[in-house]
Amino acid sequence: MKEQEIQSSMNKSVEATQRNFNTIRTGRANASLLDRISVEYYGAETPIKSLASISTIDSQTISIQPFDISSLQTIEKAISVSDLGITPNNDGKVIRINVPPLTEERRKEFCKLASKYAEEGKVALRNIRRDAVDKEKKDEKEGLISKDVSRDNQLEIQKFTDKYISLIETKLSEKEKEILKV
């Protein structure tokens, strides 16, 4: 694997971890809370953001305005049955979601969830490292590169891995602070 490929793959893993973090409630209204919720629409699972305009009115309220009014009920139902613990209010045209402040217990649950997402991201990085190191060893075995070059490349791969793992840990600590902030 080339250096650029490795960094690109690792960057994608960090971005995926960040997207997972964005779906965790922090007690503040945020449109990305709804990113993981899909709705059955004309026989296909469709993300809410594809069916409606989502905006935050203030720090506690999210507004969802469906492009097609007939999808209002299904969007409301999907939000109700989600694991977000929020209740949508439907006024016939717009769905409003009041995001209540989080309880201490719920904050701790979300911190655990953030840690789980961070660990998944680190595992993905380690898998990328393993694949890259295996390729280096294979190239060395086939005589394509010398033992010294292989070892240098493996050390470089480890440096990338350490860099990106520390980046995930930084993002995790930021997210935990955001969750625990009252």
Swiss-Prot record:
InterPro entries for this protein: Ribosome_recyc_fac (IPR002661), Ribosome_recyc_fac_dom (IPR023584), RRF_sf (IPR036191)
BP GO terms, sorted: translational termination
CDD domains given in the database record: RRF
Keyword entries, A-Z: Cytoplasm, Protein biosynthesis
GO molecular function annotation: ribosomal large subunit binding
Subcellular location field: Cytoplasm
Entry's Gene Ontology cellular component terms: cytoplasm
NCBIfam families membership: frr
Function, in words: Responsible for the release of ribosomes from messenger RNA at the termination of protein biosynthesis. May increase the efficiency of translation by recycling ribosomes from one round of translation to another.
Similarity comment text for this entry: Belongs to the RRF family.
Protein name per the record: Ribosome-recycling factor
Species of origin: Prochlorococcus marinus subsp. pastoris (strain CCMP1986 / NIES-2087 / MED4)
